[in-house]
Amino acid sequence: MKIAVYGKGGIGKSTTSCNISVALARRGQKVLQIGCDPKHDSTFTLTGFLIPTIIDTLQSKDYHYEDIWPEDVIHKGYGGVDCVEAGGPPAGAGCGGYVVGETVKLLKELNAFYEYDIILFDVLGDVVCGGFAAPLNYADYCVIITDNGFDALFAANRITASIREKARTHPLRLAGLVGNRTSRRDLINKYVEACPMPVIEVLPIIEDIRVSRVKGKTLFEMVGSEPSLNYVCNYYLGIADQILSQPEGIVPKEIPDRELFSLLSDLYLNPIGGGGQKKKIQENFLGFTRI
């Protein structure tokens, strides 16, 4: 099974992806996580350091695939999760989609691409071109990470459009949304009501998740010295269980941008509940309008 994880930049995709990968490994799966971001920090939480990228390795070998061994590009992370970083072209040049293609090509050359039960692609930020949507060409499912804010839901809606487009040519499905760092879910609920899709899980604001990223450790590793974090791990195990159930998934239909703006701004102007909720919604809205 191949899973592509998308979402707005800075939403916590990589931290979420790493914890999901470990959760899947805990369920007995052989897992490979592929970071698809020029920052090449997707797997930092699994390995504790920035591993060499596929592109760096190819360049050092003058693109002679026959001179590259699996151990040159596949690094062992926490919990037995194997890690690969695709890397990216130089800033302002090249195409991220080409890099993803080269990564998959090399893994196939090494007979590694089909050796895993789960391959998880952790993909950079918003989908702005076909190149960044390239991992969807290989995925069975897409998971979108969001929060309860305007920006993240607009990005989710754009990703939804990419899923629909890619699903025309192969059996790609949206498994659902994962809410991250979310104290409320009113905007999420409003969005999925208008654009029906599953909500796999909604994680509350948990400071230890942010701290885990800084430490370069997954929550599963941290729980060894902090047993009180077990409850956080259960969120990720629940997500893993839903993925392993091979959900039917959907081919979503995105909402036109202006309609989405109207939909979410209506909730801002006509909040349900007291002044505290209205203030929180206003903060989300103003954060969007400043962009």
From Swiss-Prot:
Recorded hits in InterPro entries, A to Z, give: NifH/chlL_CS, NifH/frxC, P-loop_NTPase, Protochlorophyllide_ATP-bd
Cofactors: [4Fe-4S] cluster
Its Gene Ontology cellular component terms are:
chloroplast
Cofactor remark: Binds 1 [4Fe-4S] cluster per dimer.
Residues at which Mg(2+) binds: S14
- State its location(s): Plastid, Chloroplast
**Family listed:** Belongs to the NifH/BchL/ChlL family.
Name of the featured protein:
Light-independent protochlorophyllide reductase iron-sulfur ATP-binding protein
